C-alpha cells in the first residue's frame, strides 16, 4: 500500500480524475487530501461526490481547508456569507443550484454538509510526516494548534515543527505550478484553478509527483528536480 497526497482541488474534477489515473492510485492505497475542495473551479459538486465515493474504500483521509471553513461560517451570518462569496463561494453555489433558480446554500445536500463537518480532519500525523492545510505553529502539539495557523497562515511563516516531522501542506499557490520542497515543509498547492495551474499528487515515500490540469494534460517529476515533463 502506498500513501498519496493531493493538494488543493478547488472544484477541478477533470484534473482530479486525470491525476489519480496518472499516479495509478488504487482503492488499496492511502489517499490524503489537503482540503479546499470547493470554490473557484467549475466542478465542485463532482469533486465532493467523488470524495464521498472514494471514502467507501476506507482509505481516504480528507482534511479541512479554509474554504470549507468559510462556507460553514457563511450559514451563521450575512457578513460571513458575503466574505465567502467574495473568495470563490459563487462558484460553489453555481455548481449546486438548478438552472434558472436563485443561487443559495439550500441546494447543498445534507450528505455533503456531513462530509465537510463530520468527516474532514484538521490534520493527520504519521511516524514521519504531518499533513495539514496551511501551516503549523512550531512549538505547539497538534491538539493545541491555532485555527489561524492551521488554515490561514502561509507555509514558510514558521520554522520547522518541534516534532522534527516534515509538514506537507497546501493553501499557498506555488509559482509556475511547481510544488515547493523546503526540507521541513512541502507545499502541494499548485493553483489548478488558475491559468497555467496544475493539480499535484505526491507519492510520499518516493517523492515522485504527478500533475494534471483542467485540459486533462498530465506530467510528472521528482521533488527537487527542476521541472516536470
Residue ranges and their predicted role:
Residues 140, 146-213:
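Conserved beta-sheet core of the metallophosphoesterase superfamily
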Residues 10-14, 39-42, 69-72, 124, ...:
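Active-site environment of divalent metal-dependent phosphoester hydrolases
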Residues 5, 31-33, 62-63, 130, ...:
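Residue-level marker for buried hydrophobic side chains located in beta-strands
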Residues 8, 36, 65-66, 92, ...:
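Divalent metal-coordination and catalytic microenvironments
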Residues 40-121, 153-154:
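Active-site neighborhood of divalent metal-dependent phosphoester bond hydrolases
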